[in-house]
Amino acid sequence: AGGAAGEEIDRYDPLLGSPSHALVIASSREHRPGMLRTIEEIHMTGPNDVPDDDIRSDLTFFETPAGGAVFAAGSISYAGALSPNGYQNDIARLTGNILRRFIDADPFTMP
């Protein structure tokens, strides 16, 4: 089974528009050589084998002023990590907890 972070990863970064009150639930680190930042951040060519702490996938959560909330998986590969072991794994459990809270009628409150 693959991991929850693969190609097309996104990270929490207030300088790029992430809400300052967002909670980073988990992060992937130490990706394989050749992984890149988001395309919007690549302004020139250069070596891609230099360690870069900004190459990561962040699972984030934040509340909105209207009583809603946002969960961002941080990677297109997240969905592929749900089914291993018959959905009996940490990613499936985390996702289930998030979905149960999202269908709850109680509004979220801003911190």
Report each predicted region and the residues it spans:
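Extracellular ligand-binding/catalytic regions of CAZymes and related secreted enzymes
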Residues: A1-P111
